[in-house]
């Protein structure tokens, strides 16, 4: 039963978000393994766009070095509260829409991310916002880094 509760909670948050959440179910272990299969850790900096309830976030923490940082950007306040329950000093939560955060001073200190994982629905963004997010993300990536 405990495994079902996060799935129901995610579904309810997605439905009540007014179109701000791009998925109605959490990422499965199969999806997480597929996304991360070619990523070798430990990494110093990882950025996650749209972490939702943190299912991928927890997997990303395993790829992070002990001194590393995982920056997660989430626009849904209910998901932010869930993310805040993850007890790991390496996680830094930024609440806001990626198209606003990516151009703000909150991102100025980030240099050379080894990995950027996006779970946001780019189709929800305006063309100019989508291009801006991709351009700014590319500028954040270290040499030989991944954006998935």
Q: Which sequence ranges carry the predicted segments?
A:
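Glycine-rich SAM-binding Motif I of class I
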Residues: 54-58
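Short glycine-dipeptide loop
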Residues: 66-67, 141-147
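Conserved SAM/SAH-binding beta-strand->alpha-helix loop
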Residues: 76
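Conserved class I S-adenosyl-L-methionine
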Residues: 43-52
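A short SAM/SAH-binding and catalytic strip from SAM-dependent methyltransferases
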Residues: 113-128
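Class I SAM-dependent methyltransferase Rossmann-like catalytic core
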Residues: 4-41
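S-adenosyl-L-methionine
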Residues: 80-108
């Amino acid at each position: 039963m405990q495994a079902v509760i996060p799935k129901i909670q995610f579904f309810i948050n997605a439905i009540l978000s007014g179109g701000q959440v791009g998925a109605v179910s959490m990422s499965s272990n199969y999806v997480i393994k597929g996304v991360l299969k070619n990523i070798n850790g430990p990494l110093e900096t990882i950025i996650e766009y749209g972490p939702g309830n943190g299912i991928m976030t927890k997997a990303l923490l395993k790829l992070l070095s002990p001194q590393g940082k995982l920056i997660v950007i989430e626009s849904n306040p209910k998901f932010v509260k869930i993310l805040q329950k993850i007890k790991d000093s390496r996680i830094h939560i930024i609440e806001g829409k990626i198209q606003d955060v990516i151009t703000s001073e909150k991102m100025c200190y980030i240099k050379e991310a080894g990995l950027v994982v996006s779970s946001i629905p780019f189709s929800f963004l305006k063309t100019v916002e989508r291009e801006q997010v991709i351009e700014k993300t590319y500028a954040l990536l270290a040499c030989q880094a991944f954006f998935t």
